[in-house]
Swiss-Prot record:
Species lineage: Archaea, Methanobacteriati, Methanobacteriota, Methanomada group, Methanococci
Positions contributing to ATP binding: 348-356, 369
Note describing how the cofactor binds: Binds 1 Fe(2+) ion per subunit.
Keyword flag Aminoacyl-tRNA synthetase: no
Cofactor list: Fe(2+)
Principal location: cytoplasm
Protein name, as recorded: Probable bifunctional tRNA threonylcarbamoyladenosine biosynthesis protein
Any Gene Ontology CC annotation: EKC/KEOPS complex
PROSITE patterns: PROTEIN_KINASE_TYR
Assembly description: Component of the KEOPS complex that consists of Kae1, Bud32, Cgi121 and Pcc1; the whole complex dimerizes.
Amino acid sequence: MDISKDLICIGFEGTAEKTGVGIINSKGEVLFNKTIIYTPPVQGIHPREAADHHAETFVKLLKEALAVVPLEKIDLVSFSLGPGLGPSLRVTATTARALSLSINKPIIGVNHCISHVEIGKLKTDAVDPLTLYVSGGNTQVLAYTGKKYRVIGETLDIAIGNCLDQFARHCNMPHPGGVYVEKYAKNGNKFIKLPYTVKGMDISLSGLLTAAMKKYDSKERIEDVCHSLQETSFSMLTEITERALAHTNKAEVMLVGGVAANNRLKEMLNVMCAEQNVDFYVPEREFCGDNGAMIAWLGILQYLNGKRMDLNDTKPISNYRSDMVEVNWIPEENNENIKSRIIPEHLIGKGAEADISKGRYLEFESITKERVKKGYRILELDELIRMRRTVKEARFLTAIKELGIYAPSIFDIDKERKKITMSYIHGKIAKEKIEEGNLDFCEDLGKIIGKMHVGGIVHNDLTTSNFIVSDNTFVIDFGLGKYSDLVEDKAIDLIVLKKSIMSIHYDKFDLVWNKIVEGYKTYEMSESVLECMKEVEKRARYL
């Protein structure tokens, strides 16, 4: 094929209950794009029924598409290789293979999640965004670093779309339930406290779902439960996006996926981005949910940059993670022009939770950490979170010293302003030391974490930004900390750290992580925690 000419690609999307066919050219012009959603006769989607729907609907959509763009003009066939439901993926792959063979044109299987990101970039002005991808089967925070889209944060159990749909089914709402939850939520006027679970840049939604169902069963107004479910879950999503933003220092945030159609979620992210002084993008609704055009576009990007497949390579991958894909279509020279998040001059740091300023307390150098109000959260929830975390942080900074772990000294706590003044530590954060190639302290990190875990303390936000290395290594930022003797809580603590290292220090990951594990192994309980860690990583479903 002559790749110097304008290529036309047809894309087949069928990872769950939506069947999509799209045609796009290499200029990024969408020539055809239509999606049909399978609506089950009873609540819940059966994978086999969804696959049967694809088999019938692809034929119909293909006829419509080829009435717009004749078959002889198609140069390339692309399809969603995964992740998704096995039966749906197999029907989609079979359809794409059949067309590819019949017209003797090349075929490319692409990652469904990354397709969302790339069509979003095409349809907005985003260049290098931190992407929140939210749908029925996926909840991820993605960032491009080191020739891969890295999963910076994600759900530890169910996806946000699934959470909303399951709640809607429980309340006898039609499918897809998220639309009806949003509709009811607009008329809610009472906030009901529900579980709010953030662990580093990950979230857990299963406890929230169960609690919301119980509130509905206890005869709370459905409008109030929907309002509270949305406010809680979307605040969690916005918070982990903000945490990832602080960790990666990206200057753009983009929202994609089916749940991106929710106006309240868009509003919350827009407010957060304004507070962080970064740009916010969301593609038009047609390109938020699953569609064939996004599959076709990623197929073109990969093909034009050397990706080739034969039929043996087209077996679907139901657990096809975004970070399994080697990105060959983003030029390295782009990195030189990428913008970074700008920290206000009067601050020495601006995290997801707090503004950090330097000063003096009596004769001592100090820093002040103020948990500022978050405009994206409703007042009741925001006050609760900021107060709880301020008190927690002060408590745990004192508690870890009793375990022989170094931490800043607290000078003053202002509960009204959610502000802590503490000693200034001369040193560098671990993130900077690793970037410089200094890894001598990494084993000490493992020992410190082991000492915390033996003492029954789980940090819940372990990143390389939360250790300060000087003559000794200090641990900071305990706002998410808790007491726990559960092996799984300690395993998740390590997983949070592992993912943060992989996302930023990918080129040094093995060296850094192995040193941390060696240090952690000096404690007796380490073996059971490390084994549990493997089990937790295996059972992650939403990819």
